[in-house]
């Protein structure tokens, strides 16, 4: 399980305030806290900063690379912002987060990923809505496969997100989410998700996040963007990986425990 730290995100009021004030010390401390918690990469999102989004993402990426060698996940709904920020990311393992399945997003970002040799997250969203499982998902995954082939972009560099919808507003979607995840995996793609979406606008958010993660892992999830400062959630992620892994999951789990 590839774990990406979600905490540097301007949708969080505390992070937005720090970005507005230029409080880089507290932001970099949070980067380091996530690294100590055991993540493999750091997500950086300045999307709530309006016209300052791109400039702040560039500075955030530069400063983050001064305090950690972990790969960066540059996170924006705007393809141009990702195109502007990507050349500033010097560390190996860059992840572009994210394209949708709309041509206006998918075409430039698959080309950028091919040029840079980076990974790319593709959200199963089109025209602002989640792609439905079944024939609609099959058609979109086929188009994605054809696009990757045309660019010689290896499939293993693309993670498809089945899109976790908030339980508060889509209480019947979890079964559909699992079906979308299974269809993505059956098509030969790796799968990633933003875990905390499930608990948006719900009480006791951490309980819902903790409940969903092992279910998704059992259905083939490969990577997750989540809060690594929730120690119980991190423990569950590592333990579930040990139980489900056919490789070095147990040894990874023991190494993780020794690092605490």
Please state what every model-predicted region is.
Residues 108, 114-259:
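Catalytic alpha/beta core domains of metabolic enzymes, predominantly
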Residues 2-6, 40-44, 72-75, 94-98, ...:
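Hydrophobic faces of well-ordered beta-strands that scaffold small-molecule active sites
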Residues 35-70, 163-171:
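Glycine-rich, proline-tolerant flexible connector loops at the mouths of alpha/beta enzymes
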Residues 8-10, 46-50, 78-80, 100-102, ...:
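Active-site-proximal loop/turn and secondary-structure-junction residues that shape catalytic pockets
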Residues 84, 90-122:
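Active-site-proximal beta-alpha core segment in soluble small-molecule metabolic enzymes
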Residues 6, 51-91, 174-193:
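Alpha-helix-loop-beta-strand connector modules within alpha/beta enzyme cores
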Residues 36-39, 69, 91, 118, ...:
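A structural motif
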Residues 3-29, 53, 97-103, 127-135, ...:
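Active-site mouth loops of central-metabolism enzymes
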């Amino acid at each position: 399980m590839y774990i990406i730290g979600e905490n540097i995100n301007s949708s969080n009021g505390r992070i937005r305030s720090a970005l507005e004030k230029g409080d880089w010390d507290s932001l970099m401390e949070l980067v380091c806290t996530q690294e100590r918690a055991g993540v493999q990469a750091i997500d950086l999102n300045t999307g709530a900063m309006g016209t300052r989004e791109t400039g702040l993402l560039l500075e955030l990426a530069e400063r983050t690379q001064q305090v950690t060698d972990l790969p960066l996940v540059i996170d924006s709904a705007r393809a141009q912002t990702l195109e502007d920020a990507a050349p500033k990311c010097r560390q190996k393992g860059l992840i572009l987060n994210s394209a949708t399945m709309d041509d206006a997003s998918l075409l430039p970002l698959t080309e950028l990923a091919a040029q840079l040799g980076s990974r790319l997250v593709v959200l199963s969203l089109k025209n602002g809505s989640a792609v439905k499982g079944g024939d609609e998902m099959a058609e979109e995954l086929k188009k994605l496969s054809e696009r990757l082939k045309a660019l010689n972009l290896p499939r293993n560099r693309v993670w498809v997100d089945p899109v976790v919808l908030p339980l508060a507003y889509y209480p019947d979607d979890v079964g559909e989410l699992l079906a979308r995840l299974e269809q993505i995996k059956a098509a030969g793609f790796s799968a990633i998700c933003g875990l905390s979406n499930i608990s948006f606008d719900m009480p006791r958010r951490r309980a819902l996040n903790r409940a969903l993660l092992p279910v998704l892992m059992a259905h083939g999830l490969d990577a997750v963007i989540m809060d690594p400062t929730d120690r119980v959630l991190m423990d569950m992620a590592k333990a579930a990986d040990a139980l489900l892994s056919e490789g070095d999951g147990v040894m990874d789990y023991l190494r993780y425990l020794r690092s605490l």
